[in-house]
């Protein structure tokens, strides 16, 4: 992976080693983003025409290009590690050894089975070792991996593994609660169900007290 930050390369290698990387083909380095958008727009035009839509209508004529731009620059931007957020780690001079929790992180992802929306929130906690991470970086990491075709179980484990790798500690926990529009808007059309996934590492898995403290934070209990 050329021209990646040290953190992005480290994270990618950790996910590959654990079998948690999103299924990806070898990168097509010869294609820049503008070429990708042009090709996607062309294929989207064909799909819309096969649906018998009239692309000469002023409401539809730019839709293939809008979709292509949205895919490459927005909802699937996390497929490109060049977009991995800049990470700020601070030496733990304060010797913080209690749980740090970031709750209700908004995430919007895309179901890789049907390419429809996953809409949810994540709660992430860790117990610092040698470093602490800028709090907004946790949100950005969640959003980066959400900006891919995903399954929720993998997304949860990816966030856990990435933070363990960057922070140099296994003491990380992640919980995601999300509504899947492949369930809500099609198939069974269940508009009220939600899916919760949790991934625990280190003390969050081995210590009942630490685990319960995290789960209380997830449930917003004092």
UniProtKB/Swiss-Prot annotation:
Group of enzyme by EC: hydrolase
Reactions listed under catalytic activity: GTP + H2O = 7,8-dihydroneopterin 3'-triphosphate + formate + H(+)
SUPFAM superfamilies listed in its UniProt record: Tetrahydrobiopterin biosynthesis enzymes-like
Organism superkingdom: Bacteria
GO molecular function: GTP binding; GTP cyclohydrolase I activity; zinc ion binding
Biological processes, Gene Ontology terms: one-carbon metabolic process; tetrahydrobiopterin biosynthetic process; tetrahydrofolate biosynthetic process
Pathway of action: Cofactor biosynthesis; 7,8-dihydroneopterin triphosphate biosynthesis; 7,8-dihydroneopterin triphosphate from GTP: step 1/1
Ribonucleoprotein recorded as keyword: no
This protein's GO CC annotations: cytoplasm
Lineage summary: Bacteria, Pseudomonadati, Pseudomonadota, Gammaproteobacteria, Enterobacterales
EC number: 3.5.4.16
Keyword terms: GTP-binding, Hydrolase, Metal-binding, Nucleotide-binding, One-carbon metabolism, Zinc
Binding site for Zn(2+): 111, 114, 182
Positions of transmembrane segments: none
Protein name as it appears in the record: GTP cyclohydrolase 1
Gene: folE
Family according to the record: Belongs to the GTP cyclohydrolase I family.
Subunit structure: Toroid-shaped homodecamer, composed of two pentamers of five dimers.
